[in-house]
């Protein structure tokens, strides 16, 4: 059986070590960002339900997005991020970090 040139180039790629959860080692993996950082359990402590958290974060993310869109027009109707945004960080991630840091006041039902 002969190996084609494209298959040979694939065969030449060294294998990547697989993560073994039984080893107890966590090396090689970065701390996840976004919905898992801040932890969802800590976010749920700040609202009455997971549904309230979704609405709360979505409203704030929309405000942040509108703020960025209006910067070029010179209209500053919305408040920008209250935490230092990371490079290419999404508005929802920023909103969740603001909620986690207790930087916002929210009344449910509004």
From Swiss-Prot:
Q: Which UniProt keywords apply?
A: DNA-directed RNA polymerase, Nucleotidyltransferase, Transcription, Transferase
- Is Nucleotidyltransferase among the key words of this record? yes
| One Gene Ontology term, aspect cellular component | cytosolic DNA-directed RNA polymerase complex
UniProt GO molecular function: bacterial-type RNA polymerase core enzyme binding; DNA binding; DNA-directed RNA polymerase activity
A Gene Ontology biological process term: DNA-templated transcription initiation
Tell me which EC number(s) this protein carries.
Answer: 2.7.7.6
Reaction it catalyzes: RNA(n) + a ribonucleoside 5'-triphosphate = RNA(n+1) + diphosphate
Q: Does the keyword Phosphoprotein apply?
A: no
The EC class name is: transferase
SMART domains xref list: RNA_pol_Rpb6
Q: Which PANTHER family match?
A: DNA-DIRECTED RNA POLYMERASE SUBUNIT OMEGA (PTHR34476:SF1)
Q: Which family does it belong to?
A: Belongs to the RNA polymerase subunit omega family.
Q: Could you tell me what this protein does?
A: Promotes RNA polymerase assembly. Latches the N- and C-terminal regions of the beta' subunit thereby facilitating its interaction with the beta and alpha subunits.
* Self-association and partners: The RNAP catalytic core consists of 2 alpha, 1 beta, 1 beta' and 1 omega subunit. When a sigma factor is associated with the core the holoenzyme is formed, which can initiate transcription.
| Name of the molecule in the record | DNA-directed RNA polymerase subunit omega
Give the source species.
Answer: Mycobacterium tuberculosis (strain ATCC 25618 / H37Rv)
Q: What is the lineage of its organism?
A: Bacteria, Bacillati, Actinomycetota, Actinomycetes, Mycobacteriales
